[in-house]
Amino acid sequence: MAVYTDINEIELGAFLRHYDIGTLTSYKGIAEGVENSNYLLHTSSGSFILTLYEKRTNREDLPFFLGLMQHLAKRGLECPQPVVRNDGAMIGQLAGRPAAIVTFLEGMWMRRPTVAHCEAVGEGLAHMHLAGADFPMRRRNGLTLPDWRPLWNLSRKCADTVEQGLVAETEADLDFLEKNWPADLPQGVIHADLFPDNAFFLGDRLSGFIDFYFACTDILAYDVAVCLNAWCFEKDFSYNRTKGAALLRGYTSVRPLSEAEADALPVLARGAAVRFMLTRLYDWLTVPAGSFVVKKDPMEYVRGMRFHRQIESAAEYGLEMQEVAA
């Protein structure tokens, strides 16, 4: 979450007249994240999140994102719910941006996830995949293999200013992934951005997932690979196999991985590291100074790319053979 577009109390008040959520008492911007502008609203009837969708978010995708949240909640998954306007719509206009309000999810994200948190996230992710199996809408992943090289080309000429040799490394990884990306693995709705700041906890109990604005239809095991990257590396960039084993144990306790999915996990994890390095690199080089946004270091995922190159099997991530479907 982040703030790119500022709003004032007068225009916010006019926008809120289209909702039945009580009287506004306070609001503040939320700085974390890189995609859309987000505000925490407090009203006489509770707390809500207001999102203004910035240029990276295609308005045509909003019915997918908001409809998915509704669908998952009906299937028992804890996540924010879109608040319907008085005219029956879920999307309005504020400060020249498409905007929506969703319910506030209780809990907090874990800055230092434990093994228990990793297991809970794995289990929750599998429940999300099963809950989304009958969601009728589809959305192409706009940040998957065919999109990585065009994105890379936007940053390529400046990449070696971030790390000498990064151009050669990234070119080699993209060549490898283009030749080895798996086909015919199970697909469905994936979160695609399930980092620690998108999972809320009350103690060790998972209270729900947020920020579904990268959700799409893609390889289910790729979502697992994203989580291995996001949850199982320590501050010194070392991989924590105990956390990885817990995340995989949690996931496979609900949805066992097929042998093909397990075999593909090292390639998928390497691809996930490249994907997040590329978007971080682009933002690192292009987000203007003074923006109310926390830029994230792409080198974290360069180190992840280097780690995944050495991995030969999912067992090295902590996957046990009994967690693979026969």
UniProtKB/Swiss-Prot annotation:
PANTHER family: AMINOGLYCOSIDE PHOSPHOTRANSFERASE DOMAIN-CONTAINING PROTEIN, AMINOGLYCOSIDE PHOSPHOTRANSFERASE DOMAIN-CONTAINING PROTEIN-RELATED. Keywords: Amino-acid biosynthesis, ATP-binding, Kinase, Nucleotide-binding, Threonine biosynthesis, Transferase. NCBIfam families: PRK05231.1, thrB_alt. It is an enzyme of class 2 (transferase). Pfam families: APH (PF01636). GO terms for molecular function: ATP binding; homoserine kinase activity. Pathway: Amino-acid biosynthesis; L-threonine biosynthesis; L-threonine from L-aspartate: step 4/5. Belongs to the pseudomonas-type ThrB family. It catalyses: L-homoserine + ATP = O-phospho-L-homoserine + ADP + H(+). GO terms for biological process: threonine biosynthetic process. HAMAP family: Homoser_kinase_2. This is Homoserine kinase. It comes from the Bacteria. It comes from Brucella ovis (strain ATCC 25840 / 63/290 / NCTC 10512).
